């Protein structure tokens, strides 16, 4: 755990860009406050590692299972045509994956999703509304 890391420290650091949706076995799911892609989330590992190879096989499998659970919830709640998956970590050295719902003929369809955290930022009430929808879809 690194208390200078937004995902480890949680609180104010992660609140700048994310809103906690729920805890899963191997990760925490955050709604990305910038919602130019409705339903965009981040699945952050509970382990402070930079690379998938730093996780044990069991931890890696559990993390991927959380990603799949979250993707299923996105499809159920938002009905995207495609979910894009992105793992970068050049500047934030904590394993996390962006799940970005994409909709045919809408914003950035056919291209890479942007990382502009101020494009279409939701307030706390709007975040909770979307998070509640995701929580319900995750619970099944």
Regions found by a protein language model. Name each.
Residues 1-140:
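HIT superfamily nucleotide-processing domains
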């Amino acid at each position: 755990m690194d208390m200078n890391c937004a995902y480890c420290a949680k609180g104010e650091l992660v609140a700048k860009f994310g809103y906690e949706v729920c805890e899963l076995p191997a990760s925490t799911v955050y709604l990305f406050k910038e919602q130019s892609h409705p339903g965009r989330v981040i699945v952050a590992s509970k382990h402070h590692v930079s690379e998938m190879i730093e996780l044990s096989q069991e931890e890696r499998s559990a993390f991927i299972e959380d990603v799949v659970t979250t993707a299923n919830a996105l499809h159920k709640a938002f009905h995207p045509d495609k979910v894009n998956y992105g793992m970068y970590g050049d500047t934030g050295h904590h394993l996390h994956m962006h799940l970005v719902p994409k909709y045919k003929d809408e914003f950035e369809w056919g291209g890479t999703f942007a990382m502009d955290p101020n494009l279409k930022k939701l307030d706390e009430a709007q975040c909770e509304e979307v998070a509640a929808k995701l929580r319900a879809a995750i619970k099944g």
